[in-house]
Amino acid sequence: MSTLYTMVAPCFFGTESTLNFEVKRLGAQNIQVTDGRVAFQGGADVIAAANLNLRTAERVLLLLATYKATTFDELFDGCYNIAWEDLLPANAAFPVKGSSLSSQLSSVPACQSIVKKAIVKRLMHGHKVGTLPEDGALYKVRFALRKDTVEIYLDTSGDGLHKRGYRKNATLAPIKETLAAAIADLGRVRRDSLVQDPFCGSGTLVIEAAQKALNLAPGLRRRFAAEHFDFVPADIWAEQRQKALDEVRKDAAFEGIGYDIDPAAVALANANAKLAGVGDRCRFEVADVRKDRKSTRLNSSHTVVSR
């Protein structure tokens, strides 16, 4: 029987319903929606599928423990009780980051040190070694203290999920890819939609809308931290990547158009669309929609204006 993991996917406030629907599509179990996050359970296949497919999640975290801690001893003991040796190899590199809010243990650096010491002691005991070289794969550990309750996480994503791999450069103040994806969903973008952005910048809104319309998984062009985790085997990643490729809607009639007064931004948007795999569904043009409405298609009855 496969191990059932508890996962937490943070998201922008107000986009929880969109992320909830995405998680349901993965076949996850025991889904719980709270402000700014969606928690769910699944096997190693769901870890891979979530990272590859979730458009509006900021990252996918494994929730390893939840417990009360008002002293450093309680913080240490709760962390030590996690079976770290089943998750991390003896040579794992495991930096620790965290936060504390409205808790008696308010010093984040001190808490980081305690969590790190607990993991070190448990790994040395579990692997029966005297030293931990930390020269292997990277396992990012996170903790969150909220009102004296600790949550310990293992980050399966690595870089945030907004980093799709297609936006090598951006204009000033670009919209985050995960937020753009949520806007596309809330705007009810479909496979036959015509989406236009009159102030496209580097093209993120149109590109995310195109990927949604084509059901093109956002994570196909990048790698994830959990691809190096022993408990998420390579064959699971290969299977989930192939599944995502098989589900692309190649017959979608989507069309995306973006306008901007900056030629450099338009060139960048076209380049990003090609890198994102939707260059044949999107085009970006230099235009000032305040003056050139007749030369654009902003009055089309099938248009979704993104801003």
State where each predicted segment sits.
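S-adenosyl-L-methionine
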Residues: 2-25, 32-33, 38-56, 106-109, ...
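Non-catalytic nucleic-acid substrate-recognition regions in nucleic-acid-modifying enzymes
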Residues: 2-139
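Short alpha-helical
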Residues: 14, 263-264, 304
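Short glycine/proline-rich turn/loop motifs
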Residues: 99-101, 161-166, 248-250
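Beta-rich nucleic-acid/ligand-interaction surfaces
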Residues: 136-145, 202-203
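Conserved S-adenosyl-L-methionine
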Residues: 175-290
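Short conserved loop adjoining the S-adenosyl-L-methionine
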Residues: 291-295
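Single conserved hydrophobic/aromatic residue that forms the stacking wall/gate
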Residues: 298-307
